[in-house]
Amino acid sequence: AELADAGVQMAVNGIGGISDLESRLSVYRLLNEMGFHTPTMIHPTAFIEDSADFADGAQVFPLAYVGTQVKVGYGCIINTGAIVSHDCILSPYANLSPGATLAGGVSVGESTLIGMRVTINLYVKVGKRARIGNGATVKADVPDGGVVPAGTIWPPRQ
């Protein structure tokens, strides 16, 4: 409240939310209620194609790549070295961990966590509040709330 009273108009949410997404979301709610603008923050070493579209509050870390026609929702994190290929859609609060790779046309649902070094194949849809463990390979759609264990291939073999 003191910052807002002093005329500060912008704020950045520094809560990552890997283990406690609700903390990250509550900080965004608080910042919005207090009237702060949460700008998109893009590290100078990230490579962003001109046609990529960012909502406010998104954060892009060093050496990340965001391809053509990508849509990045409010409060998303694209962490260090992550690759978001052409035509992907990241819904609000999606969190891509370091080294995650999304092939073209991937859709990531709201408040979903994509772990480190995850690979998601072309045109896969990952549902809301899903959790994809580190090093997983995702070859088919993941439902809302789905969990893909670390180091596995989705879908599991029958």
Identify the meaning behind each predicted range.
Residues 1-43, 47:
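Phosphate-bearing ligand-interacting subdomains
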Residues 27-84:
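Hydrophobic, well-structured mid-protein blocks that either form specific transmembrane helices
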Residues 9, 56, 110:
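Conserved acidic residues
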Residues 80, 91-92, 97-158:
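Glycine-rich hexapeptide-repeat left-handed beta-helix
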Residues 21-22, 68, 140, 156:
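Glycine/Thr-rich phosphate-binding loops of Rossmann-like dinucleotide-binding domains
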Residues 18, 67, 85, 103, ...:
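Residue-level signal for short amphipathic helical patches enriched in basic/charged
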Residues 18-27, 54-60, 84-97:
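Short secondary-structure transition/capping segments
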